[in-house]
Design a protein with these regions (language model features):
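C-terminal peripheral helix-coil segments that are non-catalytic and often amphipathic
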Residues: 162-207
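Hydrophobic alpha-helical connector segments
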Residues: 66-92, 150
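Helix-turn-helix
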Residues: 6, 14, 18-48, 52
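Short, basic, alpha-helical segments at the C-terminal edge of helix-turn-helix-like DNA-binding modules
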Residues: 55-62
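Amphipathic alpha-helical segments used for helix-helix packing
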Residues: 90-111
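Amphipathic alpha-helical packing segments from all-alpha helical-bundle domains
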Residues: 109-136, 147-162, 178-189
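N-terminal positioning helix adjacent to the helix-turn-helix/winged-helix DNA-binding module
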Residues: 3-10, 57, 149
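Secondary-structure edge/capping motif, primarily at the C-terminal ends of alpha-helices
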Residues: 65-68, 96-103, 135, 160-168
Length: 207
């Protein structure tokens, strides 16, 4: 692992443990046992470190999504991909815990997030259409139903980590796997009978 990677890994650990307001570039340097100048040679500011971690999160998500283009789409693959993406979000949980504050404080991250919203939405709409055509997902019962579904889904996935940290931080029963199952259960009312059978065959449901 080179120095830049060491800085990012240590920063990720500290940011997840202490929160963005309680970690500075100097603290990261001290934890690594290197000079502040050495760290700033690689990352000039704290914002540079945070943006680099944000970029790594996006790359993780991108690679998981790209796999959907390489395989025949079915509900199992989509649920597996959702699970991987949620795992990535939790790995970089400091970004999600203070997502609004980060967007306000770091305009470059906010601009990137906003620019990605519509392409992500379009990709999900394409996936919805594919599994709808396969008879797994119900047709819309009112106009724009799945547009609302996508917005609800994004709201849930963007803020589940904050909710978990506030209410269940010290309760292992309500950990990552619980919330993944909780989010997956969100799609159940939209499934056809065929889709529900498939869902039940490879998920354990909420525990």
């Amino acid at each position: 692992m080179n120095r830049k990677e060491q800085i990012l890994e240590k920063s990720l650990l500290l940011l997840n443990e202490r929160g963005i307001e309680n970690v500075s570039a100097k603290i990261v340097a001290a934890e690594l046992g290197i000079s502040d100048g050495n760290l700033r040679y690689h990352y000039r500011t704290k914002e540079d470190i945070i943006y680099a971690l944000y970029a790594r999160l996006l790359e993780d998500i991108k690679q998981n999504i790209l796999k959907l283009d390489e395989e025949e789409i079915d509900l199992k693959i989509i649920i597996h991909t959702i699970t991987l993406v949620l795992g990535s979000l939790h790995r970089y949980k400091f970004l999600m815990i203070d997502i609004v504050g980060i967007m306000r404080k770091f305009p470059s991250i906010q601009a990137s997030y906003q620019a990605l919203y519509n392409p992500r939405k379009q990709k999900i709409k394409e996936l919805i259409q594919k599994i709808m055509d396969a008879g797994v997902l119900k047709k819309e019962t009112f106009p724009n139903q799945y547009d609302y579904f996508i917005l609800q889904f994004y709201t849930l996935t963007d803020f589940w980590i904050s909710e978990s940290e506030i209410l269940y931080r010290d309760n292992t029963r309500y950990g990552v796997s619980f919330h993944i199952n909780l989010i997956l259960s969100f799609i159940v009312p939209y499934l056809t009978e065929k889709g529900l059978e498939e869902f039940q065959s490879f998920t354990k449901g909420v525990k």
